[in-house]
């Protein structure tokens, strides 16, 4: 299986100063993908606006149609796909939107051809080609066009049993790998062990040993606490009880989110294939994001950390 065609088309679609959510909707509508429902919502912020996109792909045994198969959420986390007029072209920070939309495109095409996923797949991201930046060297840092918690609430809502949160994770000295990496599972304020099932998928997709982002407690507390966060990849856990795993697009050298010319198709193709493989297996009950028995022991002995770790985030 390859997702290269889908990626190339999505990158071409998004690398446009005039692109918006309606153009993304029109792109998919013109493909005749009947298993896909798309909603677009314009969100206005103090600094800019963005088009929030929600895509529902109905599984053959999914909850949307009355079934019982588990639903997977795929979030494309980012500040913006572009930073115009400061920077011209698609920026590194666009990776989350690119991968999530390419995965939706691939899964919907699979369904049309007769390769059906069991559970529903809900894809959420947003489109802003002119997101604001903050001063930073060697290139301006991406900023969110609207309040981040407004986006996070929308990303995490719905009947979702697990979430993959895809984000460019290149402007740090912690995870130094060309390709993509996954995180330990985060659930209700706890950082749990890395899912063995997701490790297996990572290995079969890349043919390489698994690469794991060493997230810390600081990375999962709300952005209202003014301390270092590797990025916002893990923030969706704040508004859901579903387990969240980050899919980080990574590089061996620091690449700012506002850098142009940084869209590495080969890295993104592997990450997209990983996301699609997880979607296929999760809905069929072949993948677990966490061990339910171990989780029960953790909660019965130590209790929930959700309220403690969510402090400062708006409800």
Regions inferred by a protein language model and the residue ranges of each:
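Soluble metallo-hydrolase cores and metallopeptidase-like ectodomains found primarily
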Residues: 6-84
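C-terminal domain-closing interface element
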Residues: 29, 138-187
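Solvent-exposed alpha-helices and their adjacent loops that cap or buttress functional pockets
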Residues: 46-48, 63-68, 91-93, 113-117, ...
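Alpha-helical metal-binding/catalytic segments enriched in His/Glu/Asp
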Residues: 74, 83-125
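Acidic, glycine-rich active-site loops and adjacent beta-strand->loop/helix elements
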Residues: 78-81, 125-132, 170
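Short acidic, glycine/serine/threonine-rich loops at helix termini
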Residues: 86, 132-139, 174-178, 259-260
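A structural-propensity feature for long, helix-poor, extended segments
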Residues: 118-151
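Active-site-adjacent substrate-binding region
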Residues: 169-313
């Amino acid at each position: 299986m390859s997702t290269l065609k889908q990626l190339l088309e999505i990158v071409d679609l998004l690398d446009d100063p005039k692109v918006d959510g309606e153009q993304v909707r029109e792109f998919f509508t013109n493909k005749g993908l009947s298993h896909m429902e798309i909603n677009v919502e314009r969100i206005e912020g103090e600094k800019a606006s963005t088009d929030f996109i929600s895509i529902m792909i109905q599984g053959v045994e999914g909850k949307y149609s009355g079934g019982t198969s588990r639903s997977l959420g795929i979030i494309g986390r980012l500040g913006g796909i572009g930073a115009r007029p400061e920077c011209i072209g698609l920026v590194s920070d666009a990776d989350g939107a690119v991968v999530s939309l390419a995965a939706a495109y691939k899964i919907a095409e699979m369904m049309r051809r007769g390769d059906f996923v069991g559970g529903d797949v809900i894809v959420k991201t947003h489109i802003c080609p002119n997101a604001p930046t903050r001063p930073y060297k060697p290139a301006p840092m991406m900023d969110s066009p609207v309040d981040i918690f407004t986006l996070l609430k929308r990303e995490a809502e719905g009947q979702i049993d697990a979430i993959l949160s895809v984000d460019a994770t290149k402007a740090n000295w912690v995870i130094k790998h060309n390709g993509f990496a996954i995180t330990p599972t985060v659930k209700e304020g706890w950082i749990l062990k890395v899912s063995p099932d997701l490790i297996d998928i990572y290995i079969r997709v890349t043919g390489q040993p698994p690469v794991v982002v060493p997230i810390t407690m600081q990375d999962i507390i709300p952005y209202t606490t003014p301390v270092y966060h590797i990025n916002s990849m893990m923030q969706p856990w704040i508004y859901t009880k579903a387990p969240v795993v980050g899919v980080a697009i990574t590089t061996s050298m620091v690449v700012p989110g506002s850098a142009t010319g940084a869209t590495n198709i080969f890295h993104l193709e592997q990450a997209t294939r990983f996301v699609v493989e997880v979607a296929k297996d999760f809905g069929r009950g072949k993948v677990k994001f966490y061990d339910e028995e171990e989780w029960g022991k953790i909660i019965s002995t130590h209790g929930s950390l959700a309220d403690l770790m969510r402090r400062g985030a708006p409800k």
